Amino acid sequence: MSFIRSALAAAAFVALSIGAVQTASAADPENTVILKLKDGDVALELRPDLAPKHVAQIKKLVREGAYNGVAFHRVIPGFMAQTGDVKFGNMDKGFDAARVGTGGSNYPDLPAEFSKEPFVRGTVGMARSQNPNSANSQFFIMFDDGPFLNGQYTVVGKVVSGMDAVDKIKKGSEAENGAVKNPDKIIKATIEADTK
């Protein structure tokens, strides 16, 4: 009987140790983006191991303040919330409701970095046109699993805290492909390492 208790205790210790290692590896401040939204902060763990070029571009844009004030212009209930059009989507300066969702940044589009990482609730993926090598600054956060996106879009990270704030982002009209009138926005985006 004591052997079983010892084995269970050892198994519990190993499970807790693995959990601690996973938590520690998910807490890399250099690859954590904090999005300040109206309903709270959202922490995104970026994955340079999956998409190094995309992650580098997102971090560059965050550090430039390019995402501050940018609308969640396309939000489809049960699917995803899309943002990141730094050219036409800035609600604080130059918002263009007719063109939002068609712009990117002043940097070149990126080659696809598809992976086997699945699109599940909280996954952060890069938006693009039909051309797989057209992602630039726009990204989306999954409300639910989307296996039909697997291997078709670049995964750049996942939400590690604040999914409740993501769930409260103003939804768009399904009849208009998720277009949002008077959309919510990213109030401010920062790299966690820069705030310490």
From Swiss-Prot:
Pfam families: Pro_isomerase. Residues 29-194 form the PPIase cyclophilin-type domain. It is found in: Periplasm. Its EC number is 5.2.1.8. Gene3D superfamilies: Cyclophilin-like. Residues 1-26 form the signal peptide. GO terms for biological process: protein folding. It catalyses: [protein]-peptidylproline (omega=180) = [protein]-peptidylproline (omega=0). GO terms for molecular function: peptidyl-prolyl cis-trans isomerase activity. Keywords: Isomerase, Periplasm, Rotamase, Signal. InterPro entries: Cyclophilin-like_dom_sf, Cyclophilin-type_PPIase, Cyclophilin-type_PPIase_CS, Cyclophilin-type_PPIase_dom, Cyclophilin_A-like. The keyword Signal applies. GO terms for cellular component: periplasmic space. This is Probable peptidyl-prolyl cis-trans isomerase. It comes from Brucella suis biovar 1 (strain 1330). The gene is ppi.
